Amino acid sequence: MEDYLVKSVAENGQFRAYAVNATALVEEAHQIHDTWSAASAALGRAMVGTLLLATSGLQGEAGMTVKIQGDGPVGFIVVDGTAQGTVKAYMQNPHVHLPLNAKGKIDVAGAVGKTGTLSVTKMAPGDKTPYTGEVNLVSGELGDDFTYYLAQSEQIPSAVGLSVFVQSDDHIEVAGGFLIQVLPGASDEAINHLETTLRELPLVSDLLREGKTPEQILETIFAGRDLKILEKMPVEYKCDCSKDRFEKALASLSKDDLQEMIDNDHGAEAVCRFCGHKYHFSEEELKYLVATK
């Protein structure tokens, strides 16, 4: 099944609802970063959560950076997402495998840690000062933490479900999630019914493994109730790095630092943390940067 996200309104405009299948892009992140099972699940959930936040809360060319800093063995996780449904990510320690938790599932909270922060920085073209909101982690499972962020930082009552199923060989079998936002004027009856449904809902990974599409996941949540699909959009892992961008970073270094690279290494190599692409700068290119200072 292809990776894509759907946007909808439900219960005659009482809820906004989003669902995404992100299996291929989470597998791509696994391939790029050589993530082990617990790290794959943590990184995958962070990427799916960022996709849902970015596509629901941004417009045009705007983007956001989500940083999760817990006290678990994976260290920090950084994810960039855009309104267009693209995402890229990296993490401090991708080689984390843990025993299964008490429910027999991958221990994402153990990998991320239960103490730490989740921050979201939003940037739009022309913005001089980006907006950043930050909350403490509440569980380290990440779905709860994104839900808490939306309630505390954006004052949007929401429910976020994130799920990644990792195979025994560390490949990603399925990955996806949903985001439901309660809109002003939603009735107590509708909210209570939704809460009951979500408590009984299977894991998103189980629904995806059954072959359910993002539309069918939302139909399962709002079974027998009004649901209007508004948009279907592709999502993908996409890095926008370039040699020009790394050259600007090198140009910001001091003359002494650049000269040291010339004298010791006769050049420089930059590696993108998001995609692993390597960019080589020759001795002549570095000398040009020194001469322009």
Curated annotation (Swiss-Prot):
PTM remark: Under oxidizing conditions two disulfide bonds are formed involving the reactive cysteines. Under reducing conditions zinc is bound to the reactive cysteines and the protein is inactive.
GO biological process, one term: protein refolding
Top-level taxon in the UniProt lineage: Bacteria
Disulfide feature: 239-241, 272-275
Pfam families named in the record: HSP33
Summary of the function given for this chain in its UniProt record: Redox regulated molecular chaperone. Protects both thermally unfolding and oxidatively damaged proteins from irreversible aggregation. Plays an important role in the bacterial defense system toward oxidative stress.
Name of this chain's protein: 33 kDa chaperonin
Organism (species): Limosilactobacillus fermentum (strain NBRC 3956 / LMG 18251) (Lactobacillus fermentum)
Gene: hslO
